[in-house]
């Protein structure tokens, strides 16, 4: 729907209802908890109640006034106008964080988000949403001050701790020399050395591992034949950012030790053959015994902790993404709702024109064109209805549905992806299938995920090989409906076959690993099963069942 049609419909609604704010979507605009305004040429056309309350203005007081009222200075008003005057010619949405002045002269910090009503007709103006973040800013300032105080305290404590550590290291060195002199305590020392839950190694200036305990052998491993050196170890080492570290450049090697000690350096270790990966926290001290420099290093296995940290990071990222999707769903539903009435009005006008033309000679061609316009408006209304149903919150209700129609509706949502990736969709649907009791939105979500995965799996294949097959059949006992999605993509690695449905497991660089987990939960809640199988050398087939 164009911006002119929206403006025309607004004028008609106001004329019919005497500008009553309780009519149609005016109620939504006026009573939404978000501060919203409509601008044209940097002047207010209309503001909702929340916007006027936020900045201390009476109802209608800002109408037709310049937005200069909200800027702290003339300079800021002029500068922002010059910098962003042509912003929407290159971008769809504007978002900024800035101070805004209220009517009483007080200043509050806000997040300002705006976009054109109609990108094809900028003269209609733009819509803006303002969020008050003053309390958040004050909290940030308080937190920053607290952090600065804490940093000073930590620095002081660190200096004290460094003194204690140096003193402790001297005591340890003294005790070690005493133990070497006292040979009668050697046996006790060796037992303690090998019973420690952390790996310990002693390395000389040439990189030879002179001594290591059992835990070190289990964590790092050692060659079967001496001499044992770091160069002979089969492992590959890397930092937390993935940068490889040569064995001779390991932080605890003598050549790289700049100070007497290093503390809790995290480093990754991967075996060349098994590709098994571990994470270690390494601390070391530089000692001089009998005139020879040696390094004593302690290795702690932190693999489990690193996995937990990664899972927490993925969970946090997913919660953030779901929050954005939630907001987008609300906006999509509101847009579908607001565009519905203009479509119905346009459809009624066209149908009226068509009825009048039926009795006019020579108007058959015009009547046919109007019929096509009516058909396209019906299709637009149906698309809006599907979008609204798909994104709105709903209580899962299972009703008898034609599974073929559910599949077709899902493909309509993915038509853009299908054409963009040059994918050929091969439908193998049984005619007139029996009705299946299901929650349409949830099953569409499953199909959406499986079809999208199939399209992405074939993105690097030759265009003629990008064939996606979707089909269904009734089970041999007649009690369930089988639906499958089969692609001819790169396939799934052997190591990933058994973990395909594990939460947070993914083979995609930007994936989160929860899509198939959610799909399986939905299918199981319907009393069905979701399974995966390979199809030849390449390709994958996902199949799920639903009770009839």
Curated annotation (Swiss-Prot):
InterPro entries cross-referenced by the UniProt entry? HATPase_C_sf (IPR036890), His_kinase_dom (IPR005467), PAC (IPR001610), PAS (IPR000014), PAS-assoc_C (IPR000700), PAS-like_dom_sf (IPR035965), Sensor_kinase/Photoreceptor (IPR052162), Sig_transdc_His_kin-like_C (IPR004358)
Q: Does the keyword Nucleotide-binding apply?
A: yes
What EC number(s) does this enzyme carry?
2.7.13.3
Q: How is it modified after translation?
A: Autophosphorylated.
Q: Which reaction does it catalyse?
A: ATP + protein L-histidine = ADP + protein N-phospho-L-histidine
Q: Which residues carry this modification: Phosphohistidine?
A: 337
Keywords noted in UniProt? ATP-binding, Kinase, Nucleotide-binding, Phosphoprotein, Repeat, Transferase, Two-component regulatory system
* EC class name: transferase
Ranges for domain PAC = 94-145, 263-314
Give all residue intervals belonging to the PAS domain.
Answer: 20-89, 185-256
A GO molecular function assigned to this protein is: ATP binding
Q: Which GO terms describe its biological process?
A: phosphorelay signal transduction system
Q: Where is the Histidine kinase domain?
A: 334-548
Q: Which Pfam families match?
A: HATPase_c, PAS_8, PAS_9
The record's annotation in NCBIfam families points to: sensory_box
Q: Could you tell me what this protein does?
A: Member of the two-component regulatory system TdiR/TdiS, which probably regulates transcription of toluene catabolic genes (bss operon). May activate TdiR by phosphorylation.
From the Swiss-Prot or TrEMBL record, give the protein name: Sensor protein TdiS
Q: Which gene encodes it?
A: tdiS
């Amino acid at each position: 729907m164009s911006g002119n049609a929206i403006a025309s419909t607004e004028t008609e609604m106001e004329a019919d209802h005497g500008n009553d704010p309780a009519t149609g979507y005016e109620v939504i605009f006026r009573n939404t908890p978000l501060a919203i305004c409509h601008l044209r040429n940097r002047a207010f056309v209309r503001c909702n109640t929340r916007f006027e309350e936020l900045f201390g203005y009476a109802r209608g007081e800002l109408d037709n006034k310049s937005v200069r009222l909200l800027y702290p200075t003339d300079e800021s008003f002029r500068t922002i106008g010059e910098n962003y005057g042509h912003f929407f010619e290159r971008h769809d949405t504007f978002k900024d964080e800035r101070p805004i002045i209220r009517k009483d002269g007080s200043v509050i910090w806000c997040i300002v988000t705006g976009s054109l009503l109609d990108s094809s007709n900028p003269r209609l103006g733009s819509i803006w949403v303002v969020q008050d973040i003053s309390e958040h800013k004050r909290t940030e300032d308080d937190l920053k001050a607290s952090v600065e105080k804490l940093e000073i305290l930590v620095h002081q404590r660190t200096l004290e701790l460094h003194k204690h550590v140096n003193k402790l290291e001297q005591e340890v060195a003294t005790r070690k020399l005493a133990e070497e002199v006292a040979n009668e305590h050697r046996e006790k020392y060796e037992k303690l050395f090998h019973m420690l839950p952390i790996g310990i190694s002693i390395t000389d200036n040439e990189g030879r591992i002179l001594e290591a305990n059992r835990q070190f052998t289990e964590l790092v491993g050692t060659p079967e034949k001496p001499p044992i050196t770091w160069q002979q170890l089969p492992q590959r080492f890397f930092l937390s950012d993935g940068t490889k570290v040569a064995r001779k450049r390991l932080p605890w090697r003598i050549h790289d030790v700049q100070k007497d000690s290093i503390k809790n350096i995290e480093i990754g270790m991967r075996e060349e053959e098994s590709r098994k990966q571990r994470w270690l926290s390494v601390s070391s001290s530089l000692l001089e015994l009998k005139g020879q420099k040696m390094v004593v290093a302690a290795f702690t296995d932190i693999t489990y902790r690193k996995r937990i940290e990664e899972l927490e990071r993925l969970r946090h990222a997913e919660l953030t993404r779901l929050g954005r999707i939630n907001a987008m769903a609300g906006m999509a539903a509101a847009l579908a709702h607001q565009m519905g009435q203009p479509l119905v009005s346009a459809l009624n006008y066209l149908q009226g024109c068509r009825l009048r033309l039926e009795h006019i000679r020579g108007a058959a061609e015009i009547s046919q064109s109007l019929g096509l316009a009516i058909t396209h408006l019906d299709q637009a209304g149906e698309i809006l209805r599907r979008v609204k149903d798909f994104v709105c919150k709903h209580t899962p209700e299972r009703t008898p549905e034609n599974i073929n129609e559910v599949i077709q509706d899902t493909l309509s949502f993915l038509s853009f992806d299908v054409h963009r990736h040059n994918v050929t969709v091969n439908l193998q649907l049984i005619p007139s299938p029996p009705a299946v009791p299901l929650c349409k939105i949830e099953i569409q979500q499953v199909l959406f995920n499986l079809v999208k995965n199939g399209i992405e799996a074939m993105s690097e294949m030759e265009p003629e090989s990008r064939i996606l097959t979707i089909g269904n059949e009734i089970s041999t006992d007649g009690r369930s409906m089988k639906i499958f999605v089969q692609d001819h993509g790169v396939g799934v690695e052997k190591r990933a076959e058994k973990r395909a449905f594990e939460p947070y497991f993914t083979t995609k660089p930007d994936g989160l690993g929860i899509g198939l987990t959610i799909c399986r939960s939905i299918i199981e809640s319907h009393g069905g099963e979701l399974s995966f199988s390979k199809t030849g050398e390449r390709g994958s087939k996902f199949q799920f069942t639903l009770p009839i």
